[in-house]
């Protein structure tokens, strides 16, 4: 059962490739992936992470820093690596100008 939904969309050109913004949004693992991309890919990657992390935060009862949320792809699907956020399903989508993220928080059923 879905407990909460978060969604966010961002225009890629609004994303700035500045170090202080990058470390605010990306986890240490994500920064490694980010660093091997070209400039266009970096902007799209960062926009996607911004959108999905905003969506995740919207589902939570307590605030969390974006860079504490660690996302990676497993079998071509985005997955939250944080144990405490395992009950949140996510999807990231990219279009020429935009990135969108949606997060579905599932009930614990306890």
UniProtKB/Swiss-Prot annotation:
UniProt EC number: 2.7.8.7
Organism: Mycoplasma capricolum subsp. capricolum (strain California kid / ATCC 27343 / NCTC 10154)
Role: Transfers the 4'-phosphopantetheine moiety from coenzyme A to a Ser of acyl-carrier-protein.
Keyword Amino-acid biosynthesis: no
GO cellular component terms given for this protein: cytoplasm
Enzyme class: transferase
Alphabetical list of Pfam families matching this protein: ACPS
Protein name: Holo-[acyl-carrier-protein] synthase
Residues that, per the record, bind Mg(2+): 8, 54
Listed InterPro entries: 4-PPantetheinyl_Trfase_dom, 4-PPantetheinyl_Trfase_dom_sf, ACPS, Ppantetheine-prot_Trfase_dom
Keyword DNA-binding among record annotations: no
Cofactor(s) annotated in UniProt: Mg(2+)
Record-level Gene Ontology MF annotations: holo-[acyl-carrier-protein] synthase activity; magnesium ion binding
Keyword annotations of the record: Cytoplasm, Fatty acid biosynthesis, Fatty acid metabolism, Lipid biosynthesis, Lipid metabolism, Magnesium, Metal-binding, Transferase
Family: Belongs to the P-Pant transferase superfamily. AcpS family.
Superkingdom of origin organism: Bacteria
Reaction equation(s) it catalyzes: apo-[ACP] + CoA = holo-[ACP] + adenosine 3',5'-bisphosphate + H(+)
GO biological process terms, semicolon-separated: fatty acid biosynthetic process
UniProt subcellular location: Cytoplasm
